[in-house]
C-alpha cells in the first residue's frame, strides 16, 4: 500500500517536511513544483469532497493557470491531509482536468450549465484564449466592449446621456423612459386605428360629396378602386378622390385644411415631435457620433420618423402644385405612382414597435439570442429550402395524372410545401392521389424534424443571455473588484492553509499576488468622484 507524504505544522514561519526537517514556504514550493524527479510525482486535488489524483508534469503544461502555477495553487494546500482543497463545482472539474491531460481541449459536461462552467473557467484561470475558444464552440457572442459602456467626458453631457440612454440610472431617467414607452404605444395604436373603415369612409365620403362632381357608372367603379388603395395608407382626406376624377376640379380648396386638422394627424405630429426631440438630444450628448449611427436602435429611431416628414412634404407640394385634371391618363398614372410610393413609406411606421426593445430587457435578450443563433437559423432556412424543392417536385409528379390536381406546376407547389413543412396547413392546396398523400405525409414529418433540430441550441443561447443579464443586475448592487490572481488574505478555516502558522510562513512568498482593481471599476470610481 502506497504511503502518502504529509507535512506537519511547526512554529509560525516554518514548515516541516516528511522527514521532519525544517523548510520555509519558498523551499516547500520549489520542492513541490520543481523539476527533476519531483515533476513525476503525483498530487491530490479535493473538489468538494471528491478526490482527484494527477501528476505534476500534467499540470505544468499550462504554467499560467491556477493549477499549473505552484505559487498560485499553494494557497489552497491542506498540509494536514497533503492535498489541495477547492470548494468548487465537482462535475465541472472533470472537464478542467481533461483540459490539462489533453493539452488544451476544453469540453463542457452535458450536466453543467453554460454560465456555471464559464465561472469555473475563470476561477481556474485557464486564460482569455481558452475562454474565447470555448465561447466560439458553444455558439455564444464574443465578449469585449459590451459591458464597458463609454460615457461622455463632459459632466453635463454625461448627465443628459444617462438620463435618456440608461433608464435604470436614476428616477428622472425612469420617468423619461415611461413617457417614451407611452408615446410609442400611442403611435402604434393610431397607426392601427386610422385604417378602420369608419375613419376611412369619413374622409372619402366628405370629399366626394363636397366636390360636386358627377361621374358615370363605368368611371365610378375604377375611381372607387383607386380610392380604396389611397385610403389604405394615407391620412383621412390627405389625397382627395375628387382630384382624380375626370372633369372635376381640385378638392384641396373644398376640403380646406382637413389634412392638418385631422385628429390622427395631430396625434401623430405630437408623437413625432417627441421622437425627434429624443433623437436629437441623444445625438448631441452621445460620446461618439460614429458609434451612434452604428447602433441598430438609433437606425430604428430614424426609420420610425422619416415617413412622417416625407408624407408631410408630399402633401404640401401637392397642395401648392395641384392643377385641374382635364381627363389625361398621364396625371392618373402619376397619382397612382405617388400613392404606391407613399403606401410603402407609410408601412415603415410599423417598425416603431421595435423602439420598445430599448426599454425592455426581454426583447434585448431575444435579439441577442437570435444574433448568436444566426448560424443555426441559416442552416434551418437552408434545410427548409431543400425540402421545399424536393417535396414540391415530388407532389407535382405524383399528382400529374389527376385532372383535378391543385398543383399545376412546381412553383405553384412551393406554397403547399412551405405550409406543410411548417405544420401550418391552410388547406387551400392538398394532394388527392395516394402517391400525393404519401408525399405530403413525408413532407410533414421532415418539416417537424427539420424545425426541431436547432431548437436546443437556440434555447441554450437564450438561457445563457438570460442568466448573464440577471447576474449583472445582481452584481450591479455591490462594489465588485476583479483581479487576475487570488488574494492571499484568508481567514482561519479547517484546512491547513487557513492555519495562522502556515499563513504566516508563506505570507512573504505570496505577497506578489495581491489583487489590483479592474480597469472598468477604476474608471467607474473616477467618474463617480467627478
Swiss-Prot record:
Q: Which InterPro entries match?
A: BTB/POZ_dom (IPR000210), Ion_trans_dom (IPR005821), K_chnl_volt-dep_Kv (IPR003968), K_chnl_volt-dep_Kv1 (IPR003972), KCNA6 (IPR004053), KCNA6_BTB_POZ (IPR046988), SKP1/BTB/POZ_sf (IPR011333), T1-type_BTB (IPR003131)
What GO biological process terms does the UniProt entry carry, in alphabetical order? action potential; potassium ion transmembrane transport; protein homooligomerization
Record keywords, A-Z: Cell membrane, Ion channel, Ion transport, Lipoprotein, Membrane, Palmitate, Phosphoprotein, Potassium, Potassium channel, Potassium transport, Transmembrane, Transmembrane helix, Transport, Voltage-gated channel
Residue positions where Phosphothreonine is found in the record: 528
Q: Where is the lipid attached (S-palmitoyl cysteine)?
A: 286
Q: Give the membrane topology.
A: Multi-pass membrane protein
Stated name of the protein: Potassium voltage-gated channel subfamily A member 6
Organism expressing this protein natively: Rattus norvegicus (Rat)
Amino acid at each position: 500500500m502506497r504511503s502518502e507524504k504529509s507535512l506537519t505544522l511547526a512554529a509560525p514561519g516554518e514548515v516541516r517536511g516528511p522527514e521532519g526537517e525544517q523548510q520555509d514556504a519558498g523551499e516547500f514550493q520549489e520542492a513541490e513544483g520543481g523539476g527533476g524527479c519531483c515533476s513525476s510525482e503525483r498530487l491530490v486535488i479535493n473538489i468538494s469532497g471528491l478526490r482527484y489524483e494527477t501528476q505534476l508534469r500534467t499540470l505544468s503544461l499550462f504554467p499560467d493557470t491556477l493549477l499549473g502555477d505552484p505559487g498560485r495553487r499553494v494557497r489552497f494546500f491542506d498540509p494536514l491531509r497533503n492535498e489541495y482543497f477547492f470548494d468548487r463545482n465537482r462535475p465541472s472539474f472533470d472537464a478542467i482536468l481533461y483540459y490539462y491531460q489533453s493539452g488544451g481541449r476544453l469540453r463542457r459536461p452535458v450536466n453543467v450549465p453554460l454560465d456555471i462552467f464559464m465561472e469555473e473557467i475563470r476561477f481556474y484561470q485557464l486564460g482569455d484564449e481558452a475562454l474565447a475558444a470555448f465561447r466560439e464552440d458553444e455558439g455564444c457572442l464574443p465578449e469585449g466592449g459590451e459591458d464597458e459602456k463609454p460615457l461622455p467626458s463632459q459632466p453635463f453631457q454625461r448627465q443628459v446621456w444617462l438620463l435618456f440612454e440608461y433608464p435604470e440610472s436614476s428616477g428622472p431617467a425612469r420617468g423619461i423612459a415611461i413617457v417614451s414607452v407611452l408615446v410609442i404605444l400611442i403611435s402604434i395604436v393610431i397607426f392601427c386605428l386610422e385604417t378602420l373603415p369608419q375613419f376611412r369612409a369619413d374622409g372619402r365620403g366628405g370629399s366626394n360629396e363636397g366636390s360636386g362632381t358627377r361621374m358615370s357608372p363605368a368611371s365610378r367603379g375604377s375611381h372607387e378602386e383607386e380610392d380604396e388603395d389611397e385610403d389604405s395608407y394615407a391620412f383621412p382626406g390627405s389625397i382627395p378622390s375628387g382630384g382624380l376624377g375626370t372633369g372635376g376640379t381640385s378638392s384641396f380648396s373644398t376640403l380646406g385644411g382637413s389634412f392638418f386638422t385631422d385628429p390622427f394627424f395631430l396625434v401623430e405630429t405630437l408623437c413625432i415631435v417627441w421622437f425627434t426631440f429624443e433623437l436629437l438630444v441623444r445625438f448631441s450628448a452621445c460620446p461618439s457620433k460614429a458609434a451612434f449611427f452604428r447602433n441598430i436602435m438609433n437606425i430604428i429611431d430614424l426609420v420610425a420618423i422619416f415617413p412622417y416628414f416625407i408624407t408631410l412634404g408630399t402633401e404640401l407640394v401637392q397642395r401648392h402644385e395641384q392643377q385641374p385634371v382635364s381627363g389625361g391618363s398621364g396625371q392618373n398614372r402619376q397619382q397612382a405612382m405617388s400613392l404606391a410610393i407613399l403606401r410603402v413609406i407609410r408601412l415603415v411606421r410599423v417598425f416603431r414597435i421595435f423602439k420598445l426593445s430599448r426599454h425592455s430587457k426581454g426583447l434585448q435578450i431575444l435579439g441577442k439570442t437570435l444574433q448568436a443563433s444566426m448560424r443555426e437559423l441559416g442552416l434551418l432556412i437552408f434545410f427548409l429550402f431543400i425540402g421545399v424543392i424536393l417535396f414540391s417536385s415530388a407532389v407535382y409528379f405524383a399528382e400529374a395524372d389527376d385532372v383535378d390536381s391543385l398543383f399545376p406546376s412546381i412553383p405553384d407547389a412551393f406554397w403547399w410545401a412551405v405550409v406543410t413543412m411548417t405544420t401550418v396547413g391552410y388547406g387551400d392546396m392538398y394532394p388527392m392521389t395516394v402517391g400525393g398523400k404519401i408525399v405530403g405525409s413525408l413532407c410533414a414529418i421532415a418539416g417537424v424534424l427539420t424545425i426541431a433540430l436547432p431548437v436546443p441550441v437556440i434555447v441554450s443561447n437564450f438561457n445563457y443571455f438570460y442568466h448573464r443579464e440577471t447576474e449583472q443586475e445582481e452584481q450591479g448592487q455591490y462594489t465588485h473588484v476583479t483581479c487576475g490572481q487570488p488574494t492571499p488574505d484568508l481567514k482561519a478555516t479547517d484546512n491547513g492553509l487557513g492555519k495562522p502558522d502556515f499563513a504566516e510562513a508563506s505570507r512573504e512568498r505570496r505577497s506578489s499576488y495581491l489583487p489590483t482593481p479592474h480597469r472598468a471599476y477604476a474608471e467607474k470610481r473616477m467618474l463617480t468622484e467627478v
